[in-house]
Amino acid sequence: MKDRENDGNLESRIFVGGLSWDVTERQLESTFDRYGKITECQIMVGRDTGRPRGFGFITFTDRRGADDAIKHMHGRELGNKVISVNKAEPKVGGEDVDQLKKGGGYSSRGKGTEDECFKCRRPGHWARDCPSTGDDRERFRVPLAMRSRIGDIDGHRDRYGDRDLEREREREREFDRYMDGRRDRDGGRYSYRDRFDSGDKYEPRDHYPFERYAPPGDRFVSDRYGMPEHHLENEYRGRERSYDRDRYARDTSDRYGDMGPIRDEGRPYRSRPGPYDRPSRPGGRPSSYERW
């Protein structure tokens, strides 16, 4: 008999969530009594605080009143907040009649066994029916359980970007410490900052500029145009051959005396005799038969 009464109350009992904190049971009853006779109207309060939890239960005398209330009041405003109205059903666990009358053993049908919104963690409504609008929507976008991770949600601050930036800076500091330790172990040879700044990865470092660069007049073509090493060798060989020719000319001038540089000093280059020319006739130009 008691179970049959509970089943009858269950069919005519509705769950009202998203209630404003200042809505009273009398206001709630006067709002829903147009859809049928109400036998019970309760707003749930906290056991420890005694404050309203934002939801309540209404029991009609028949099922039709409950259905009409759900049809016309679900998603409407009450006390400047949008409310949700659904069928109420007892939680699994076999509560007695007194617990059902207190409302502690009921939840909205089709919504699971929890009576809190996972968005704002407020009781009395579900995520899809969350009445938070305007600033409240921004404030309760993240569950309250994550507030300790994010920071000041009430101040509309999102510190994920700051945390990522700080994490990136910490990685850079760790890398700097690693490279400094490696440089210390290797005797200062591997300074990654110096290596990347200089642009030459394998060339040795000189203490003075003249040790690295020759005077402008002695620079080779390969230095200006980045020629390979074998071109540099050809340049050196050419300079050696030029040096050998100059030394041969000096030896020849010393050997023949008057054919040395002193005799040709001040004369144009074309008028100077070649290394195999006979001495020119006095006052004349050497002829072709004088060469051998």
UniProtKB/Swiss-Prot annotation:
Expressed in roots, rosette and cauline leaves, stems, floral buds and flowers. Induction: By cold stress. Down-regulated by dehydration. Residues 180-210, 220-268 have a biased composition (Basic and acidic residues). Residues 93-114, 180-292 are annotated as: Disordered. One of its GO terms (molecular function) is nucleic acid binding. Disruption phenotype: No visible phenotype under normal growth conditions. This is Glycine-rich RNA-binding protein RZ1B. It comes from Arabidopsis thaliana.
